[in-house]
Amino acid sequence: MVNEVIDINEAVRAYIAQIEGLRAEIGRLDATIATLRQSLATLKSLKTLGEGKTVLVPVGSIAQVEMKVEKMDKVVVSVGQNISAELEYEEALKYIEDEIKKLLTFRLVLEQAIAELYAKIEDLIAEAQQTSEEEKAEEEENEEKAE
């Protein structure tokens, strides 16, 4: 019984560690999704402003420079590690939206994995409770026989 409880505790701890790792990954995905959504909003805002409007562009964390919006028909988009591609404006928006969809799909997979781990934890707890109840019943039966 004691070894069985220890094994169950270790399994529960392992599942909880996996859940924490998956939650951390979801947090990173959420940050990336937020960044991509902000990029979409910024591109759309710049397009709405139109050519010739003045905007402030950040240069590092403490400086900004004034620039005029020129043509918004081309956008340079990161398509991989240190690789960028020049895309048409609408194509760039679609590319970013597709990336968001992929990340949301992956996020859903991680959430499902977390739900499965919680189900495994619940199964282990139920198993431990059942074992405990069976042992109590066995002890009571042995006590009755001893009397």
Swiss-Prot record:
SUPFAM superfamilies, per the entry: Prefoldin
Compartments reported by the entry: Cytoplasm
GO biological process, one term: protein folding
Matching NCBIfam families: prefoldin subunit alpha (TIGR00293)
Gene Ontology CC: cytoplasm; prefoldin complex
Coarse class of the protein's main subcellular location: cytoplasm
Subunit and interaction comment: Heterohexamer of two alpha and four beta subunits.
Family statement: Belongs to the prefoldin subunit alpha family.
Keyword entries, A-Z: Chaperone, Cytoplasm
Coiled-coil zones: none
Disulfide links within the chain: none
Organism field: Methanocaldococcus jannaschii (strain ATCC 43067 / DSM 2661 / JAL-1 / JCM 10045 / NBRC 100440) (Methanococcus jannaschii)
Gene3D superfamilies cross-referenced by the UniProt entry: 1.10.287.370
One Gene Ontology term of the molecular function aspect: unfolded protein binding
Gene: pfdA2
Keyword Cytoplasm: yes
Protein name according to UniProt: Prefoldin subunit alpha 2
Record function comment: Molecular chaperone capable of stabilizing a range of proteins. Seems to fulfill an ATP-independent, HSP70-like function in archaeal de novo protein folding.
